[in-house]
A protein has these predicted regions:
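Donor/substrate-binding cores of folate-linked one-carbon enzymes
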Residues: 1-106
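A short catalytic or substrate-binding loop motif that flags glycine-/basic-rich loops and adjacent residues
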Residues: 33, 109-111, 133-134, 170
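Short secondary-structure boundary/capping segments
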Residues: 1-2, 45, 107-109, 141, ...
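An anion-binding loop in the catalytic cleft
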Residues: 120-200
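A generic structural signal for alpha->beta connector loops
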Residues: 6, 113, 146-148
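Short acidic/glycine-rich loop or secondary-structure boundary segments that cap or lie
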Residues: 50, 105-109, 137, 150-151
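Acyl-group handling in specialized metabolite and lipid biosynthesis
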Residues: 109-121
């Protein structure tokens, strides 16, 4: 395919390469607590996500953004970038520049079981996992009394109900709170394994 291309064989990758090479870069960026990611149009070569960079543009990640919020921001940026790409193509200016291997990071594909919550983590880290795995992804989940629970909307809190145990939901002031390794997670929307919302 690469050899048969008339002009160039390119890919649109949802990160600022060479960081976040690999699959699911938007999810990983949110999980890692990044405040921005980006979009890269780059050449395809024999190595995964390592071709010359033609164009890049930054995408902001707000603290309350979930993965679909960031996806739509990135999609808008792609549409804007394509004008510049086609302009470069018309001028025969698609060589781009080499990626810096010293800055490269790679992340593996994610699978549903990766969404299991470790309540020993900080509330902030768990919050990042929740917002990185919202619909249409499988979701961040935990088991309570042998039943699978999916967290759809949550936020970290410094304070919560006294006497709470790590990983055990407590109904407090109109919401479920779960004590974590550092702080509390306040759950605003919770579903069971059948995706039925659990009301407070």
């Amino acid at each position: 395919m690469i050899d048969s291309a008339r002009v160039a064989t390119v890919n649109i990758h949802q990160s600022l390469l060479p960081t976040y090479r690999g699959r699911h870069p938007l999810n990983w960026a949110i999980i890692k607590g990044e405040t921005h990611t980006g979009v890269t149009i780059h050449h395809i070569n024999e190595d995964f996500d390592e071709g010359n960079i033609i164009l890049q543009k930054k995408v902001e990640i707000l603290n309350n953004d979930n993965v679909m919020d960031v996806y739509w921001k990135a999609t808008e940026v792609v549409c804007e970038m394509l004008y510049g790409f086609f302009d470069k193509a018309k001028k025969g200016n698609l060589k781009g520049f080499r990626q810096d291997p010293e800055r490269a990071t790679y992340f593996p594909p994610r699978i549903p079981k990766d969404g299991k919550i470790d309540w020993g983590e900080s509330a902030e880290n768990i919050y990042n996992l929740v917002r990185a795995l919202t619909y249409p992804y499988p979701g961040a989940y935990f088991y309570y009394r042998r039943k699978k629970m999916l967290i759809e909307i949550a936020k970290p809190e410094k304070q919560g109900p006294l006497g709470s145990k790590i990983g055990v939901p407590t109904f407090y002031r109109g919401a479920f709170f779960v004590k974590t390794g550092s702080g509390f997670l306040k759950i605003a929307k919770l579903r069971n394994a059948n995706l039925i919302e659990i009301k407070n």
